[in-house]
Amino acid sequence: MIKVASITKVENGSIVTPKGFSAIGTAIGLKKEKKDLGAIVCDTPASCAAVYTTNQIQAAPLQVTKDSIATEGKLQAIIVNSGNANACTGMKGLQDAYEMRALGAEHFGLKENYVAVASTGVIGVPLPMDIIRNGIATLIPAKEEREAHSFSEAILTTDLITKETCYEMVIDGEKVLIAGVAKGSGMIHPNMATMLSFITTDAHIEHDVLQTTLSQITNHTFNQITIDGDTSTNDMVIVMASGLSETKPINMEHADWETFVFALQKVCEDLAKKIAQDGEGATKLIEVNVLGARTNEEAKKIAKQIVGSSLVKTAIHGEDPNWGRIISTIGQSEVAINPNTIDITLQSIAVLKNSEPQMFSEEEMKMRLQEHEIMIDVNLHLGEETGSAWGCDLSYEYVKINACYRT
């Protein structure tokens, strides 16, 4: 049983709150007058895990980071630039990513395979290595919340807000911390997609266990958000575990295993929701919960299909309770359903029960749809499994942002 009481949100916590981590974010000239280079550094080689974009076109930094992690399953630094994706840049791009790793290793005095690199921004433009070389040489990470917040700014592209979260848990009677930071606003349809997330913890956990756990949690969190249905070339989630919390190694046999898993899931879920809420041009966060499914996978598939529907998203933007778009989207799913047993609730107001329309107050519904967080609940009445997905409305501003992205 998960000891929920032993997990507490740390207000104003950051990626440097767990023991052993420092960070920095700075402006080096990749973007106009904004921070665009950052680093997270650990005092000791940290167990790590990562998941990557499923886009068949994978950017050079992903290939280099995969190489680093595959060597020992440990990392001690992550270097990230924004403003340039270093994707679809050929062999030169791969060489530049390896050089970026080497520069970081030399600057921080680390083995090259202890350094991960990540890039985000415009695709198909060579990375300006003179700027990168000079920039990495200026990085001086600190164990201060201010520098952690600077890092969260340095990884942004079209995002309007930074995305950070932190939790404290109790394992073996000791305080253990876990925190995360993310970027992502457009081209979000993960499995991963234009999103980067970096998670730090002082938990004592080995690479293989952490990798399995992160992969499973990602399927329920980051892979269940969608902004515009596009997948990117650069995206990844990396977890670094310093092991400095003085607990026994955490694994599936540990008495507090579920506590750690729950805390990691909360961090991932918080960041996933923040990404959905900050979708390009978004004015509303949409959460879809599907109940009564035969399997969790079927529930998640339908939830994500609803939240990704352009017609549903535009209806929510227009504050229009057009539940017909929701039921139509459910019917388009590859999941076999019973068309006569579906319930739909919008903002806690029943609009469909056993697939029959329900009377409701248009005035009350209009008022509730003016809220910034919109909840759609669907019960299929086919089984006991559930699944959720998150997204945002689709506005005129989304078109404006993406039409003018390079300019």
From Swiss-Prot:
Coiled coil: none annotated. SUPFAM superfamilies: DmpA/ArgJ-like (SSF56266). Its main location: cytoplasm. It is an enzyme of class 2 (transferase). The keyword Cytoplasm applies. The keyword Disulfide bond does not apply. CDD domains: OAT. The record marks 193-194 as: Cleavage. GO terms for biological process: L-arginine biosynthetic process; ornithine biosynthetic process. It is found in: Cytoplasm. Pfam families: ArgJ. Its EC number is 2.3.1.35, 2.3.1.1. Belongs to the ArgJ family. Catalyzes two activities which are involved in the cyclic version of arginine biosynthesis: the synthesis of N-acetylglutamate from glutamate and acetyl-CoA as the acetyl donor, and of ornithine by transacetylation between N(2)-acetylornithine and glutamate. Heterotetramer of two alpha and two beta chains. PANTHER family: ARGININE BIOSYNTHESIS BIFUNCTIONAL PROTEIN ARGJ, ARGININE BIOSYNTHESIS BIFUNCTIONAL PROTEIN ARGJ, MITOCHONDRIAL. This is Arginine biosynthesis bifunctional protein ArgJ.
